[in-house]
Amino acid sequence: MKENNNLEKLDPIATLETKFAKSSYFIADEIKDEKINAISTGSIHIDQITGINGIPVGKITEIYGNESSGKTTIALQTIAECQKTGGTVVLLDLEGSFDINYAKSLKVDLTKLIITQPQTGEQAFDMIETLIKTNSIDLIVIDSVAAMLPESEYQANMNEALMGAHARLMSKGLRKIQPLINKSKTAIIFINQLREKINTFFGNPEMTTGGKALKFYASLRIETKKADLIKEGINKIGIKTKVTTVKNKLAPPLQTCFIDIFFGSGFDYNNEIIDFAIQYGVLKKNGSWFYFNDNKIGQGREQLKNTLSKNNELFIQISEKTLEFVNNEKSNWQ
């Protein structure tokens, strides 16, 4: 094919600089491989399966699942952990279901938690945009996607059919805030629910509310499923929840763990320490007996837990050794 000598080859960079600002482009190798900052969920198990040590900063996270599967507990524990490091948190309580007593039991600092209750989804997204632009909010939690009522639906009467209004709201709102989030130091959690698909005979009969936009924009999607009840005799004292990273753009996805959530107190941190102490060999097991530094400290897991609950000094020793292993592994996650 003959070259057309009349066509002048233009320098693409010079052309961009002439027509647009210098900031309109960059060279690929100028991108810094920055470490992803994260806010701990308060659960070592969940932090581990995210691969980044918790909820990512500057990204959107969706936590979804059926009723009473641990979604709110994970969000509240994350709020508490964020506050522990001096972070500022805003909760958009669209459901109007914030439980002060439960939040307090999970060590949420109510004196520093900002709560707002927008009436519509549009108002909620306007608030999110405004909060991100302040550059002073570390975590925003939206509870929940299902309660983000579109303005059109808010003003309509009960007889009007407004198909797809919720999905359009989510698509427009997320498209608007996504560029702001990426440049911010704010982590955003959307709590979502599952509902049944109509006339589904094959595949998963459940889907999240709000259409497909949140699935697309979320960097991390965490699913919670109630796996079992935790009982003490005949009394039901908690639930065992299966947690799965269904989508993860920051680390390997489809990682799973099981966590214990106790009614009124949330995660069992001590139990998680025991799990990891056994995993890393801090606690050794011979038969039914558990050993620490070659000393018997409990026969069976329940006796072990009782021993550690009564001997705080021993628990601290085991915790410190265990967390050394956990923290070393965390550096490899990121």
Curated annotation (Swiss-Prot):
One of its GO terms (biological process) is DNA recombination. The keyword Nucleus does not apply. It comes from Ureaplasma parvum serovar 3 (strain ATCC 700970). Belongs to the RecA family. HAMAP family: RecA. ATP binds at G65, N66, E67, S68, S69, G70, K71, T72. It is found in: Cytoplasm. Keywords: ATP-binding, Cytoplasm, DNA damage, DNA recombination, DNA repair, DNA-binding, Nucleotide-binding, SOS response. GO terms for molecular function: ATP binding; ATP hydrolysis activity; ATP-dependent DNA damage sensor activity; damaged DNA binding; single-stranded DNA binding. SUPFAM superfamilies: P-loop containing nucleoside triphosphate hydrolases (SSF52540), RecA protein, C-terminal domain (SSF54752). This is Protein RecA. The keyword Membrane does not apply. Disulfide bonds: none annotated. GO terms for cellular component: cytosol. Can catalyze the hydrolysis of ATP in the presence of single-stranded DNA, the ATP-dependent uptake of single-stranded DNA by duplex DNA, and the ATP-dependent hybridization of homologous single-stranded DNAs. It interacts with LexA causing its activation and leading to its autocatalytic cleavage.
